[in-house]
A protein has these predicted regions:
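Conserved GHKL (Bergerat-fold) ATPase module
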Residues: 1-434
Length: 434
């Protein structure tokens, strides 16, 4: 892309035939200079002189091995207080945060410098592609010097603002199309919300929170939608979410049956984002649908009364723990729930699981949590009719069979029943229907 044509010999160019030429006559040719560079790339032109197809053609010129079209582009053009031109592209991004091979390229006066733009471009935007051209970026200096340079700070701030403005305009001009692209661009936006406070503020107007049913809300829309049903007795808004629509299906359906909205939050940095939102917004908390039973996740003034006495609950708890055995890692909780709810439910405490996820995805959480085993609670619904049957069963064989069946169904619902235990459950289930 150097600003002067670079000639590499000559090439033969075929010209159109004259109108009076015969069909068998060969087409005329001429020798022309073989120019091997593009001295007027798209970023040197005015945005008004370019069409959408011109931007796509330039993307293919930059990244010939990329076969997917970019989702959209941002044309950068400023001459005060610094000089900078360029085009940034939002590619389709996968869920992992691994560094991509094709990155933003840095030029000075159309001369290629590097594709390592850390310190110049905000970290969350290094996942984008494209070109930045600026004579005001100092070269051959340390990264710490680069990050402290006043011009570079202004350039970084300008790029962040332009990206935020572009996303905001896309959202306002064609929300339906923006929603369709959300899953392909959310990782950049969420990363930006975590790492740049100014971007976090701007993104509040266009960052989306999809539900498991495919509806999309901004945060303010979401608050308005759920405030009546999902505000607990302490006046805190509890936002329920799932990370695996299929794996957590039974928990999702139980929440929907109570009229609750369940968000779909499955990006690798979602635990960090939720913590940021909980600390920056007032009186909100996030809870995954399988973190506890619903009456505990969203506690209301009225509470369920247990059909079992304290003595019966202690007896039942002992019977369940006896079947689980000493090596069991489950913490048994006796809870008065709706009689139509599951007899047994396996839950994963929100705080411990989230700390572990944050540690595994890098940064945050508690040191060493990433290697800790998963923690599960076994919630026993004391109001389910089966609990009375277990307590009143005359033979220990039937009681153990009922407890095992309830336990395995709970583990199956949570995706924890595997291998030999799954095979045993299948055989036992066949025996029951013979």
């Amino acid at each position: 892309f150097m600003p002067v044509p670079i000639k590499f010999g000559t090439r033969t160019e075929t010209l159109p035939k004259p109108e009076d030429a015969k069909e068998e006559d060969p087409a005329p040719t001429q020798e022309v200079d073989d120019i091997i560079n593009n001295p007027t790339p798209a970023w040197t032109k005015k945005p008004s002189d370019l069409k959408d197809e011109d931007y796509k053609a330039f993307y293919r010129e930059l990244y010939p091995m990329q076969f997917e079209e970019p989702l959209f582009h941002i044309h950068l053009n400023v001459d005060y207080p610094f000089n900078l031109t360029g085009i940034l592209y939002f590619p389709k991004l996968n869920q992992d945060l691994a560094m991509q091979k094709d990155r933003i390229q840095l030029y000075q006066n159309q001369v290629y410098i590097t594709d390592n733009v850390e310190g110049i471009v905000p970290e969350f935007l290094t996942m984008l592609r494209g070109v930045i051209d600026s004579p005001d970026i100092p070269l051959n200096v340390s990264r710490s010097y680069l990050q402290a340079d006043g011009a570079v700070k202004k350039i970084s701030s300008y790029i962040t603002r332009k990206v935020g403005d572009k996303l905001n305009s896309l959202f306002k001009e064609d929300r339906e199309n923006f929603e369709k692209k959300w899953n392909d661009i959310k990782i950049v936006i969420e990363y930006g919300m975590l790492s740049e406070d100014k971007f976090f503020e701007k993104a509040d107007g266009f960052a989306l929170y999809p539900t498991v049913d495919g509806a999309y809300y901004t945060f303010s829309e979401l608050q308005e939608k759920v405030k009546d049903s999902q505000t607990d007795k302490d006046d805190k808004l509890v936002l329920l979410y799932a990370s695996d629509k299929e794996g957590q299906h039974s928990y999702i359906e139980a929440a929907k049956a109570k009229g609750y909205q369940v968000l779909m939050m499955d990006s690798p940095i979602v635990s960090h984002l939720m913590q940021k939102l909980e600390t920056s917004k007032e009186k909100i908390s996030f809870a995954r649908v399988d973190a506890d039973h619903l009456d505990k996740l969203i506690q209301k003034e009225e509470t369920q009364i247990s059909k079992l006495s304290d003595e019966e609950k202690d007896k039942l708890k002992g019977q369940v723990e006896e079947v689980l055995g000493e090596k069991s890692s489950y913490m048994v909780q006796m809870e008065a729930m709706d009689s139509n709810a599951s007899p047994f439910m396996i839950t994963e405490p929100e705080f411990m699981r989230r700390m572990k996820e944050m540690q595994q995805s890098g940064g945050g959480g508690m040191f060493g949590m990433g290697n800790m085993p998963d923690m599960y609670n076994l919630v026993v619904n004391t109001n389910h009719p089966l609990m009375g049957e277990i307590l009143n069963t005359k033979t220990s064989k039937k009681r153990i069979r009922l407890i095992n069946q309830c336990l395995d169904l709970a583990r199956l619902s949570k995706g924890l029943l595997k291998g030999e235990e799954l095979t045993s459950f299948i055989h036992r289930s066949y025996d029951m229907v013979k």
